[in-house]
Amino acid sequence: MLTTLLQSDLPGLPLRHCGKVRDVFDIPRKRLPVDTRSGEYLLIVATDRLSAFDVVLPDPIPGKGEILCQISNFWFQKTEHLMPNHLTGINVASVLPDGIDKTLYTQRAVVTKKLKPVGIEAIARGYLIGSGWKDYQRTGKVSGIQLPDGLQEAEKLPDPIFTPSTKAAVGHHDENIDFDTTVKMIGAELAERVRDATLRIYHFAAKYAAECGILLADTKFEFGTDIDGRLYVMDEMLTPDSSRYWPIDEYQVGTSPPSYDKQFVRNYLETLDWDKTAPGPTLPQDIIDRTRAKYTEALQRLAGINID
């Protein structure tokens, strides 16, 4: 049975970062298994918070964090032959403080390596949609990459492209950047490794998703390095929050297809007299239920996991 969690409450675990959806805690070494105490580890909790237009909304989507965690874990396991990831395999319950309801966390949290984020969002696009479509209409390019003339909205690109962005703080907007800017920010060697890993994973995931009847239009990864400079994929992976998934049977060039994400929420918010700054408006129950159903369907179709 799915639980609902809006804010993590874990006495004894120092809160390192509170993001739009995830709460990140340092794990004191005394709480770790003896054979892992030589490293540094984090507990990452996927809450049921929902953000839209970079604003965290007041209403949670029940079970969303569990669904996101399970989808991420599925993809981390499925792509580990392509790229190492931040997971450790340490049992979540073993690091949680005593005296809390651990069932709130065991299906929505993971113990991870503590890595140094590379400082950019790594985005792969296989289709022309969203901010990429807007850039193309204005300049004929996406993140500095020249594309053929005459492409339509939602059209498949000749080849997937790497279109990084800055990583903004909560409440601020990410900005698309070109590869040269990425090189200036993180260095040429690391930029090339991140680009190559992003496209490698995208190719693999898009092929698998298509076999499930789903198009992976675009997706966003985060990467980090360890003290030896080894690159890992981290945070979340190929979830409906970080990816644009479309049902193949509803895909049509020239229009924005329905997606397995919070589009119901965005569409509803666009009907309101709201300036897209905090605090966000409350959501009707129907919008919450329909959004949750989309996340649940994505988990079932991609990972074969039924949670209801």
From Swiss-Prot:
The biological pathway it contributes to is: Purine metabolism; IMP biosynthesis via de novo pathway; 5-amino-1-(5-phospho-D-ribosyl)imidazole-4-carboxamide from 5-amino-1-(5-phospho-D-ribosyl)imidazole-4-carboxylate: step 1/2
Catalytic activity annotated for this protein? Answer: 5-amino-1-(5-phospho-D-ribosyl)imidazole-4-carboxylate + L-aspartate + ATP = (2S)-2-[5-amino-1-(5-phospho-beta-D-ribosyl)imidazole-4-carboxamido]succinate + ADP + phosphate + 2 H(+)
Enzyme's top EC category: ligase
Which Gene Ontology MF annotations are present? Answer: ATP binding; phosphoribosylaminoimidazolesuccinocarboxamide synthase activity
Write the record's keywords in alphabetical order, separated by commas.
Answer: ATP-binding, Ligase, Nucleotide-binding, Purine biosynthesis
One GO CC annotation, please? cytoplasm
Q: Name one GO biological process term.
A: 'de novo' IMP biosynthetic process
Classification via PROSITE patterns: SAICAR_SYNTHETASE_1 (PS01057), SAICAR_SYNTHETASE_2 (PS01058)
| Record EC number | 6.3.2.6
Q: Name one Pfam family in it.
A: SAICAR_synt
What is the superkingdom listed in this entry's lineage? Answer: Bacteria
Could you say which protein family the record assigns here?
Belongs to the SAICAR synthetase family.
Record protein name field = Phosphoribosylaminoimidazole-succinocarboxamide synthase
| Organism annotation | Xylella fastidiosa (strain M12)
The taxonomic lineage of its organism, from the top, reads: Bacteria, Pseudomonadati, Pseudomonadota, Gammaproteobacteria, Lysobacterales
